[in-house]
UniProtKB/Swiss-Prot annotation:
Belongs to the profilin family. Transmembrane segments: none annotated. Signal peptide: none annotated. Gene3D superfamilies: Dynein light chain 2a, cytoplasmic. This is Profilin-2. InterPro entries: PFN, PFN_euk, PFN_sf, Profilin_CS. A motif (Involved in PIP2 interaction) lies at residues 84-100. Keywords: Actin-binding, Allergen, Cytoplasm, Cytoskeleton, Disulfide bond, Phosphoprotein. The modification Phosphothreonine is found at T114.
Amino acid sequence: MSWQAYVDDHLMCDIEGHEGHRLTAAAIVGHDGSVWAQSATFPQFKPEEMNGIMTDFNEPGHLAPTGLHLGGTKYMVIQGEAGAVIRGKKGSGGITIKKTGQALVCGIYEEPVTPGQCNMVVERLGDYLLEQGM
């Protein structure tokens, strides 16, 4: 399966039990910041934004004072899982980023999608990739 198929079929799909509800944008990005696959709506990000995200995975709490920035949008960092998941909130939407061995699985949402639904979609694919040694 291509990386684009993972984004299209597993991240940008309808959320179980909520037909028509889906993430606003999604991507799979290498630890080096290279985009493996993304939705057409995923924001173009700066290398320093991805560097900050990677630093927070290695040094949890790094982004808390400044916020998580992606594509010029600032998200307030909320409780995640140190070294594994970063979650951010902005208004009625937010972001979930799951770290795997080689990649970051990113999902961005807006209402009516809930934070928990975004977490479920992103973390399910991230856990699967971890199981596959990715």
